[in-house]
Amino acid sequence: MPAPWTICSLLLLSVLCMDLAMAGSSFLSPEHQKLQRKEAKKPSGRLKPRTLEGQFDPEVGSQAEGAEDELEIRFNAPFNIGIKLAGAQSLQHGQTLGKFLQDILWEEAEETLANE
């Protein structure tokens, strides 16, 4: 019967070899990894704006005529944010949106200056 230290050393050696073999292998096939990369590059579904029936007064004009006065804002920070306002909406919500953006950008500028 082999000595206990021989059995322990063989067991330790086999565990180390198994760890080295597992560290170099991948659980996913190369084809699956390529498929995941392709799926990640696909653009995400875009949200469609709701139709605003009866929101515009006849004096202001139709939605097609107000399309020239659209305001569109996009952010590409950690995630995409898009805001699109028609002429009447920008008059109604523009000041609030401007204050919101100013607060966000001002906080980021202060953090950047504090980190430097």
UniProtKB/Swiss-Prot annotation:
It is found in: Secreted. O-octanoylated by GOAT/MBOAT4. O-octanoylation is essential for ghrelin activity. Amidation of Leu-97 is essential for obestatin activity. A lipid is attached at S26 (O-decanoyl serine). Disulfide bonds: none annotated. One of its GO terms (cellular component) is extracellular space. A lipid is attached at S26 (O-hexanoyl serine). Keywords: Amidation, Hormone, Lipoprotein, Secreted, Signal. GO terms for biological process: actin polymerization or depolymerization; decidualization; dendrite development; gastric acid secretion; negative regulation of apoptotic process; negative regulation of endothelial cell proliferation; negative regulation of inflammatory response; negative regulation of insulin secretion. InterPro entries: Motilin_assoc, Motilin_ghrelin, Preproghrelin. Residues 51-74, 98-116 form a propeptide. One of its GO terms (molecular function) is protein tyrosine kinase activator activity. Its main location: secreted. The keyword Transit peptide does not apply. Residues 31-42 have a biased composition (Basic and acidic residues). A lipid is attached at S26 (O-octanoyl serine). Residues 30-62 are annotated as: Disordered. Belongs to the motilin family. This is Appetite-regulating hormone.
